[in-house]
């Protein structure tokens, strides 16, 4: 168990790593000596502050966040439901396997181009973020269900324990580490895929459109500023979702213990 001193050391180490990275960036910017090729961190920070106070910035953040978060939430719910069904009825897994394998194998760019034919561009980030993270969440939840203690499940069936009670007391605790690991991998992927869809589809009012415009007009500082915004949103969203899931599992454990 880490002590307060250990935590303080880790905090200083992280801060030192950030300072080192910024120093390397600034040194590279001085070496290149071209704001077009590589603006320094101070220049990018200035552009970020200038963009952050505009209404267009807030609209773009809200637009992309709602759609990418919505796609992830939809994938999480559907993956959980279908994994439960596949765990209970093996035929469901057999029927779903070709689709899951296809989604894993097909390049995201192919899905984006197809989706541009099928739907409005405003729905593109939601659909692509959903599609890219669904297989990760589904396979992880299914693996968690299969890791549940078989003897406990047999005993529960022998004593005719209701399935809902089996779910709360046996299956969900087994799923927890697999689901958290899957979410940790899928959350970043949802933002990468969603923003890539926005850039390729030039989705109006999105963060991806801002990246595209910055590239077209050779505004490298703006490009890096918008990239920093996307990274920050992805990190905050990941921490929020994982914290909510952990809290939900803790409440479930307390409920099962009473």
Question: For each predicted feature, which ranges?
Answer:
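Periplasmic/extracellular loop-to-transmembrane helix junction in inner-membrane transport proteins
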Residues: 3, 31-73
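Transmembrane-helix boundary motif in ABC transporter permease subunits
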Residues: 70-100
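Generic hydrophobic transmembrane alpha-helix motif, especially the helices
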Residues: 101-136, 143-144
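Short cytoplasmic-facing helical segments at TM-TM junctions of multi-pass membrane proteins
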Residues: 140-179, 211
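C-terminal transmembrane helix and the adjacent membrane-cytosol boundary/short C-terminal tail
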Residues: 90, 181, 224-258
